[in-house]
Amino acid sequence: MHELHQIIDETIAALEDIKRSGVTHVEVSSETLDRLSSAGVSPVVLRDNGTGETPALLEIAPIEARADACTMCPELVRCRHNVVFGVGNARAELMFIGEAPGADEDAQGEPFVGRAGQLLTKIIQAMGCQREDVYIANVLKCRPPENRTPLPEEVANCLPYLLAQIELIKPKVIVALGATALRALLDVQLGITKMRGNWYNFRDIPIMPTFHPAYLLRNPAAKKEVWQDMQTVLAKLGREAPRRAKSEE
């Protein structure tokens, strides 16, 4: 196992031991907070579920810091401005996973903030949620040059970070946005057109594949299919789309 992957696994194991011991918070010095801030660690919205569990931010922050310092893909390291780790509710029931950051995401350090991201936000709102209610991430944490498709070795290098996010967030449902996200998790070769709209399973978590918002910008007619997929997701979560969204189908 690569040294970085081993470090991530050991970090997660140590945090799980701390949680099992009954620790509910960790004192952090102002100097440590300053270092985390300068490292580009993005804020994560927490939801207190009243169970006394260790806050998810304390679990995710070390993994995010490792990703921020990662140099495993030299070409991506040379081109990136920011590592784009993830954003949202670290106790979310619903997690969206895309392909990789684009130019806007690389500049701002947050996933899905460009045109495709704005469309994703509208989809989330149509589902009766806000971005702060869900968790959003990509397979790759760094932007590929010219927004090219991620290389297999880049996906392999970055996948441990995504797996750690899934393990710590423990979503009830994952939406895979596009073929890259789906193939990274399920190791399948079928296209997204054939697989979308059907349930698959990843480590006992249901996965719904659907078209990437960037595809919808090029093919607006496919929005109807994506909305059908999102209604299926809501049903899996035991929810319904808001009445206004239903009327606009």
Features from the language model and the residues they span:
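A polyanion-binding, active-site-adjacent surface
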Residues: H2, D17, T24-E249
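Short intrinsically disordered, low-complexity coil segments enriched in acidic
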Residues: T11, K19-G22
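Charged, compositionally biased N-terminal leader segments and the immediate start
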Residues: M1-L15
